Amino acid sequence: MKSVRYLIGLFAFIACYYLLPISTRLLWQPDETRYAEISREMLASGDWIVPHLLGLRYFEKPIAGYWINSIGQWLFGANNFGVRAGVIFATLLTAALVTWFTLRLWRDKRLALLATVIYLSLFIVYAIGTYAVLDPFIAFWLVAGMCSFWLAMQAQTWKGKSAGFLLLGITCGMGVMTKGFLALAVPVLSVLPWVATQKRWKDLFIYGWLAVISCVLTVLPWGLAIAQREPDFWHYFFWVEHIQRFALDDAQHRAPFWYYLPVVIAGSLPWLGLLPGALYAGWKNRKHSATVYLLSWTIMPLLFFSVAKGKLPTYILSCFAPLAMLMAHYALLAAKNNPLALRINGWINIAFGVTGIIATFVVSPWGPMNTPVWQTFESYKVFCAWSIFSLWAFFGWYTLTNVEKTWPFAALCPLGLALLVGFSIPDRVMEGKHPQFFVEMTQESLQPSRYILTDSVGVAAGLAWSLQRDDIIMYRQTGELKYGLNYPDAKGRFVSGDEFANWLNQHRQEGIITLVLSVDRDEDINSLAIPPADVIDRQERLVLIQYRPK
């Protein structure tokens, strides 16, 4: 009966966090609008081999993540939930692997359930796992690969070992098809310390080639298909998207070595109080084979991405699966022996909630700031933000009432965030970061436009997805579409600032021409170097400028 209650509670938890509130949040640009539009175009064109964005070749990532996203929109429609359905599914599958692996290691159902809940409620997991990017997919394949490797190394027969390594190769292959060759480097780095300490080199060398073969066979069909269709894909993807992004001096998203320290700290909420103890207990118990495996799986990718020049918080998502297992194991031991860490965790959550309440007041219309984040007419959004932090502090306090039994309720600290964050985003943020909001405000003007031009790829993708058209033209800036725009068949998809006046004269009689520009909040739009317009509609950070036929 208790198991049934736990399962009902888990399903309610998943529904409240990962299902019910998702549609209330508009898509963020540039990431969510980009991936939403790529998948929409894939469904519309029927081309499941070559990814396109705004009708242009888009070679920043391979194809598998787009497949899953496209299936999500096919099943649930072109809406906010449909766009995010794929990442939510991947996150829940990863949580299922956390459950399975914890059971495999410790044979404890309660521990497995707690590890799952901890994983799903970690701030970084929830933030990325409900956000339409490709990282939850690669995290799933990496976690599946680590589970497969463990399965192979624990098998007692050659058939079991062979099956495990074949499965490892398939997961690595799917990882390559999702985000590239990092899906090969990360698992290898993660298992090497464990293989070395356990002296398991023999099994690795005997059966490892099976993983290589299955990985190649997994990638080969699509790899050959896209090489035939687009011979330049692999050169661009390997050199630009791997070498330049991570290793060269001009790498994208450059950050210092310590970049991931605050990411891990913030990402570990609402379980931050367990982080030091979980890692220390794991190190102290390093003679235990499974603990070494989890530690290596947590730390090695973190070190690898810290050394790389290009860094983003999403890169280390897969590290939090083993960390959640270590935290759950440590928390149960602490509850029995010394609940100090659990009390500290409760106080951290209270402090975080109270700090959030104070910060919300400071940036509210009633605070001391001259330019508040929310305007007076957005009072309900301020109260939503207060509710988010109040619930966080409340559940932090509740875990302290009987800490040995109530500590798992820390998983409910982000409940207010899950349910209310979509209602608390300030208009000034929505106007710049949510193209759907802009489209809703200017729908009547945008819909009949013969041509739409914009200077932001993220806004362009949002306009294309909302209006169901992929012919948005880039104006002044090419951004990440620079490579696709270099192809001969992309001629006419970019208009420079100097060329715009002539281009306008040539195309004005064909229909309404709409220019959507990103501007600074205090920028005078009358000073823009553009021909006089028939309509100007400013929505704070985005401005619609329209030219009608003469």
UniProtKB/Swiss-Prot annotation:
InterPro entries: ArnT_tfrase (IPR022839), Glyco_trans_39/83 (IPR003342), LipidA_mod_glycosyltrf_83 (IPR050297)
GO MF assignments: 4-amino-4-deoxy-L-arabinose transferase activity; mannosyltransferase activity
EC number: 2.4.2.43
One Pfam family this sequence matches: PMT
Primary location recorded for the protein, binned into one broad class: membrane
Recorded metabolic or biological pathway in which this protein acts: Lipopolysaccharide metabolism; 4-amino-4-deoxy-beta-L-arabinose-lipid A biosynthesis
GO BP annotations, alphabetical order: lipid A biosynthetic process; lipopolysaccharide biosynthetic process; protein O-linked glycosylation; response to iron(III) ion
The protein's name: Undecaprenyl phosphate-alpha-4-amino-4-deoxy-L-arabinose arabinosyl transferase
Organism name: Escherichia coli O6:H1 (strain CFT073 / ATCC 700928 / UPEC)
Gene: arnT
